Each structure stands twice: as C-alpha cells, then as structure tokens.
A protein has these predicted regions:
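N-terminal "domain-start" segment that seeds a small globular fold
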Residues: 1-30, 162-170
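Short, P/G- and charge-enriched loop/turn segments at secondary-structure junctions
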Residues: 2-5, 111-113, 179-183
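Proline-centered helix-kink/hinge sites
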Residues: 14, 47-48, 55, 124, ...
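A short beta-strand-turn-helix
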Residues: 15-38, 58-64, 182
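Short active-site neighborhood of thiol/selenol oxidoreductases, capturing the structured segment around
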Residues: 27-58, 70-75
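Structural microenvironment flanking redox-active thiols in thiol-disulfide oxidoreductases
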Residues: 52-142, 155-156
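Thiol-/selenol-based redox modules, centered on thioredoxin-like
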Residues: 144-226
Length: 226
C-alpha cells in the first residue's frame, strides 16, 4: 500500500465529531491527556484496512495499552456511501460480517472463518459524523479541496493540474456527504493513522500502512510531560 506520512507537532488535535459510539463509552480527547492516542480511521468497504491496518492497531492495543496507549477506531465514509454505513459497521462489530470489496479481498486472502472476519476489535469504535453535501461546486471550493488534499498540486504539469481540477469537480458534484472527523484532520483516505501525544498535540498523520508506527508510538510513550 502507498503510505503518506506527515509530522505536525504544533497544534492541539481537533475534537472528534461522531454520530454515535458503536462500541465502548463516549470519549472526549480532552479526557486522555497523559496518554498517547492512536486514532485508527477506516472504512467498512476498505480491504486494505482489514488486511493490514486494523490488525496492526489490535496488536498495538494489546502490547502497549498497559503502557499508556489508547486506541480508538473511527469508521468514516468519503465514498461508497451505500456500503460504508452505520448498519454495516454494527454488523461488523457484532458478528464479524464484512461486505463489498472487503469481503472479496479477505476471501481471496483466506482471512475469513465461516464467511466472517474473525478478528475482534477490542477498543472503542465510533461512526464519523456525516454531513449532507450541498453539491454547489464553485471554482474556489475546487481549489480549496485540492490544496488540502494535494499540497504539491502547483508543482504538477499544467495538463495534470487541469485533469485534477476536472476530476475534483466531478467528485464534489456527486459527493453525498462530508465526513466531519475525516475533514477536521484533513485526511487523504483510508486507512489513516493519527497519533496524539500526552499533551493532546497532534503529532503525526499518515495514510496507508506504516511500518514505522510502532516506533513512533514508543517514542511518544517515552516522552515526559512538561
């Protein structure tokens, strides 16, 4: 999987915007000062989330939970809104039922037992808050979206910039919802991992499976709180 990492480390993490907590008690990030927080952002219809990122998050939860790591799962939706639903999230949590491309890929990789995903997610899980999109696409909205998602946009060839504008315009015109937590953290896709330090500072955001995630968690756990 392609992985994009960014180090931030200057501002407090924004608050979570969720429609409901499907597993565990409601959590406010301000309650977790003194802990290192891993936000594992996924979609139900995201094969890579289930093949790589979610199993990694489960492993980290078990190995570092007693050292001060708190893992929170955020199910989001920025596409495939008929599949990335609260109902399908509940079915996943309750019975391991998977759907769509996730079902197909897990089956191909022989990761299912009796047609179900056998991995139990042991940490709190919430559904991102979805806001209906108005689909009024303006040039300013297109440029703002591109700059947020593609910081190197202006370095692209002009022909590529024009193609990106056309694709973005079509995407926004057909967008059904905005996922509020996904947008607050300026994420680029799923799976995404967000690391927040003991002082509530947003330290890292990365898109795709990241083999360095454990090392970064260890570093944050070892930091002293000033």
């Amino acid at each position: 999987m392609t992985m994009h990492r960014s180090s931030i480390g200057q501002t407090l993490a924004p608050s979570l915007a969720v429609s409901c907590w499907v597993q565990g008690e409601p959590i406010d990030l301000s309650q977790l000062l003194g802990h290192v927080v891993l936000l594992e952002v996924f979609q139900v219809n995201c094969p890579g989330c289930f093949l790589y990122s979610l199993p990694q998050a489960v492993d980290l939860h078990y190995r570092y939970g007693d050292q001060g790591l708190v893992v929170i799962g955020i199910a989001t939706a920025f596409e495939d809104f008929d599949k990335n639903t609260l109902e399908n999230l509940r079915s996943l949590i309750d019975s391991g039922r998977v759907i769509g491309e996730t079902l197909r890929m897990l089956s191909e990789h022989q990761q299912l037992q009796n047609g179900r995903w056998p991995v139990r997610l042991p940490f709190p899980i919430a559904m991102d808050h979805l806001i209906p999109a108005d689909n009024k696409v303006t040039p300013d909205a297109v440029e703002s979206f591109i700059q947020q998602k593609l910081p190197d946009f202006t370095s692209q060839p002009i022909a590529q910039q024009n193609r990106i504008r056309e694709q973005t315009t079509a995407y926004l015109a057909n967008l059904q919802y905005y996922a509020e937590t996904f947008e607050r953290f300026a994420l680029k896709g799923t799976p995404s991992q967000i690391l927040i330090d003991k002082q509530g500072i947003l330290r890292y955001s990365r898109f795709g499976y990241d083999s360095e995630l454990e090392h970064d968690i260890q570093d944050l756990l070892n930091e002293s709180v000033s």
